[in-house]
């Protein structure tokens, strides 16, 4: 996600996490923990736009513990 500011990037990440939480509520077979880890490892970490601590804080904000 090159070329976007950090605030916009955080908004996108938060929206994605909220969507994952919504999916977990509606689909009992959806593995929220595994998908959250996958999202971090394949998207957040390589893009290096936010730190792991910032990602974990966003997770807490949307209800992922």
Spans of model-derived segments:
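N-terminal acidic leader/helix
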Residues: 2-28
């Amino acid at each position: 996600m090159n070329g976007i500011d950090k605030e916009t990037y955080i908004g996108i990440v938060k929206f994605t996490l909220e969507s994952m939480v919504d999916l977990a509520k509606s689909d009992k077979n959806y593995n929220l923990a595994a998908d959250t880890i996958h999202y971090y490892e394949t998207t957040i970490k390589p893009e290096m736009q936010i730190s792991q601590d910032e990602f974990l804080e966003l997770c807490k904000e949307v209800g992922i513990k």
